[in-house]
Structure formats: structure tokens, C-alpha cells
């Protein structure tokens, strides 16, 4: 990677991996539609390139968290249907209609605002009712769905295109809560039907639901983390072999030998036990490398694992290099990805940081440039 004139910390995203993941997920899906969820800047991978690659590979819809994220995709020429999965304020109704976005709807106030703007602009607002079947997050209770459905049916510029829910434990095989949520979802569908509302697109399955719960596929499945090649949870026998799309790299900035008894970084949490070879890397928690990985994680240099020593600082961190490894300034370092016969995954780092792989990749900050390979389908 040519980084002349740049700080040598970067991420590489393989768009062919994204395409392969989309095709693999579509092969096992029973639903006629697949939504690629690209919220949070495409889970840290880059929303526009990931969305483009996903659509090229056969994704039918895109999902985002906010109106602003949807507008960004539209500004880059993406014309596929986009559903805003998160909260939308009534004040955003004009942008929703102007950009042709679909929105999650769970209160009448937003419906009225969309109808007013739709009438003014001469456009229809398409909404997907969100049902809270057990996440306790946004959404209507199943018993409330019929009431709102009847209210929306009286509006002249709002179409109830879809109805959806979100599964809380789909990544836990055998957990009966998923079945309970689907039963509640079916009850909500019955409430809507009784109100004379029959949305064309029913959807409930996330990445884990897509891979483990075919009974949740309905008319569309949604996938985000699996699109970028990461398993929804560790320790599960997933039926699809996913291709991780992201590799995170830096370069050695300094190499030195420190005598026994030398402390490293803030708080002196690591002290050399003997004469040790220490490399300083130009990457830190401001780049998204979690401080919680201090004295826990490893990196790859010349295909060997090197432990992080001392506290990860804002812009730099230190690693201990094996005595027999001839490391030089400028050597490539892999933080996430493969090098030689070794691999460090986002899932591995998540386990060490007491979090999930989603947070690791979403946390890679915007000051880390992304470079894209496989840009031609």
C-alpha cells in the first residue's frame, strides 16, 4: 500500500468478499428479498462502497439507521430502496419524501407529518410498521398495531408497505425467546389483517435469524454484520462460510531494546522482565483500537504474534517483539486480518475487550483511511 505523505495506519476493504457474502446469504434465504444493512458507515467498512457492492451482488434493499445515512447513499447515486430502521422525527418528513426513503413508523405523529408533506409534494410516503416483540426498544406493542394501521389507512399519502420486528436472541441456538417473539409478531400481523391492512413486505430475520431461523424469513431478510463477513456471535456453528472484508494495518514506527525493569506507557502497567525488543506503532484508541486491549491483545509482524504491552495510548501503542524476529521501522503490522499463516479476527479482539465484533469494526475511526479492492464486480 502506497502511503507516501500519510500516517501509516489504514484499513483495506475487499469488496469481492462483500459480494461473496451476499451471494452466500441469498443461497440459503427462503425470502424473495434481501436487505443489506449498511448503517454506522457500513459497520465501519464504508457505507457507499459496501452498499454498491451488495447491490451488484444481488441485494434488493438497503437498511440504514438514520435519514442522514440514507441521504448520503442517495447523494452517491444509489437508487435501491432504502429503509431507515431507526427513529425519524416529524421534522424530517420532507427529506424522507424528497429522497425517496422508507421509514420505520411506530407513532401517529410521524404518519401525519409524512402525509402532510406527501400531499404538499405530490408524493407517497412508504412506511414499515415497527413492532416491539421483545427487544424493548422502538416499536409498537403487538396489541397496538391494529389501531395505528387503521389510522394510517385513512391517510391519503401514506402507504403501509411493510411490517417488521427485530429478534433479540436469534444468535443463541435453542433459545425459546426467538419462538416467543415470532408468535408475538404473528399476533401483530393478525391484528393488522383484522384492521384491513396487509403489508406486502413482512420481515423479522437479522443475520443470525437468516442463518439459523428459516421460519423467520417471511418476505425479506436483513443482514448487516454477515455482509461484511463477520459471524453474529462466537461459538456457533454458522451454516455459511463468511469472508471477512476488512483488514486493519499499520507500520512499525520505532524499534528499540529495553533493559530489564523498564516500565512502558501510562501507569507503568507493564515492566520488562528482561532485555526485550519493543516496537512502537502509530495507532491508538483515537483510531478505534480499544484501550481495553492494553496488555491483552496481539498484533502480527512478519507473520508472528506480538503481544501489546503497556496501556494503549491515544495515538500510539507498544508491542513486544520476539528476540529472534528482525523487525525494522516501516515493517507492516496487521491489527485485524491475516499475515503469513496467522490471523487475528475482530471476534478475537472483541473477546479480549469484553465486547462484540460489531463494536470493534464500527469503532475504527474516520481518521483511519479505507482503501478498497475488488471494486469491479
From Swiss-Prot:
Residue numbers of N6-(pyridoxal phosphate)lysine PTMs: 39
NCBIfam families: alr (TIGR00492)
Residues the record lists as binding substrate: 137, 314
Annotated pathway: Amino-acid biosynthesis; D-alanine biosynthesis; D-alanine from L-alanine: step 1/1
Purpose: Catalyzes the interconversion of L-alanine and D-alanine. May also act on other amino acids.
Active site: 39 (proton acceptor), 266 (proton acceptor)
Keyword Membrane: no
Protein keywords: Isomerase, Pyridoxal phosphate
Organism: Symbiobacterium thermophilum (strain DSM 24528 / JCM 14929 / IAM 14863 / T)
Gene Ontology cellular-component annotations: cytosol
SUPFAM superfamilies xrefs: Alanine racemase C-terminal domain-like (SSF50621), PLP-binding barrel (SSF51419)
GO biological process annotation, one example: peptidoglycan biosynthetic process
Protein name: Alanine racemase
Highest rank taxon of the organism: Bacteria
InterPro entries xrefs: Ala_racemase, Ala_racemase/Decarboxylase_C, Ala_racemase_C, Ala_racemase_N, Ala_racemase_pyridoxalP-BS, PLP-binding_barrel
Family of the protein in this entry: Belongs to the alanine racemase family.
Gene: alr
Pfam families the record matches: Ala_racemase_C, Ala_racemase_N
EC class (word): isomerase
UniProt GO molecular function: alanine racemase activity; pyridoxal phosphate binding
SS bond list: none
Enzyme Commission number, as recorded: 5.1.1.1
Catalyzed chemical reaction(s): L-alanine = D-alanine
Cofactors, names only: pyridoxal 5'-phosphate
Amino acid at each position: 500500500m502506497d502511503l507516501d505523505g500519510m500516517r501509516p495506519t489504514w484499513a483495506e476493504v475487499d469488496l469481492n468478499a462483500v459480494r461473496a457474502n451476499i451471494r452466500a446469504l441469498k443461497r440459503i434465504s427462503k425470502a424473495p428479498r434481501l436487505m443489506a444493512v449498511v448503517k454506522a458507515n457500513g459497520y465501519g467498512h464504508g457505507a457507499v462502497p459496501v452498499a454498491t457492492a451488495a447491490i451488484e451482488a444481488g441485494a434488493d434493499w438497503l437498511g440504514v439507521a438514520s435519514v442522514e445515512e440514507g441521504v448520503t447513499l442517495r447523494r452517491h447515486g444509489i437508487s435501491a430502496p432504502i429503509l431507515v430502521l431507526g427513529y425519524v422525527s416529524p421534522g424530517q418528513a420532507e427529506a424522507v419524501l424528497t429522497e425517496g426513503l422508507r421509514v420505520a413508523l411506530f407513532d401517529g405523529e410521524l404518519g401525519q407529518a409524512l402525509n402532510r408533506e406527501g400531499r404538499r409534494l405530490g408524493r407517497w410516503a412508504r412506511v414499515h410498521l415497527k413492532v416491539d416483540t421483545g427487544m424493548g426498544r422502538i416499536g409498537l406493542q403487538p396489541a397496538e398495531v391494529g389501531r395505528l394501521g387503521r389510522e394510517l389507512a385513512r391517510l391519503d399519502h401514506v402507504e403501509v408497505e411493510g411490517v417488521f420486528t427485530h429478534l433479540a436472541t436469534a444468535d443463541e441456538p435453542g433459545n425459546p425467546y426467538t419462538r416467543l417473539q415470532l408468535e408475538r409478531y404473528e399476533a401483530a400481523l393478525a391484528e393488522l389483517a383484522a384492521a384491513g391492512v396487509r403489508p406486502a413486505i413482512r420481515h423479522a430475520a437479522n443475520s443470525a435469524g437468516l442463518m439459523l431461523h428459516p421460519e423467520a424469513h417471511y418476505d425479506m431478510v436483513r443482514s448487516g454484520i454477515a455482509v461484511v463477513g463477520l459471524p453474529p456471535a462466537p461459538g456457533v456453528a454458522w451454516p455459511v462460510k463468511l469472508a471477512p472484508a476488512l483488514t486493519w494495518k499499520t507500520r512499525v514506527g520505532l524499534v528499540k531494546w529495553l533493559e530489564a525493569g523498564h516500565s512502558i506507557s501510562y501507569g507503568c502497567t507493564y515492566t520488562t522482565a528482561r532485555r526485550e525488543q519493543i516496537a512502537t506503532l502509530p495507532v491508538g484508541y483515537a483510531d478505534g483500537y480499544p484501550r481495553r486491549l492494553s496488555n491483552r491483545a496481539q498484533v502480527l509482524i512478519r507473520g508472528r504474534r506480538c503481544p501489546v504491552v503497556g496501556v494503549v495510548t491515544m495515538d500510539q501503542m507498544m508491542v513486544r517483539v520476539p528476540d529472534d524476529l528482525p523487525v525494522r521501522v516501516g515493517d507492516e503490522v496487521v491489527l485485524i486480518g491475516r499475515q503469513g499463516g496467522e490471523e487475528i479476527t475482530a471476534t478475537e479482539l472483541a473477546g479480549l475487550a469484553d465486547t462484540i465484533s460489531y463494536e470493534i469494526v464500527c469503532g475504527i475511526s474516520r481518521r483511519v483511511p479505507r482503501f478498497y479492492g475488488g471494486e469491479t464486480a
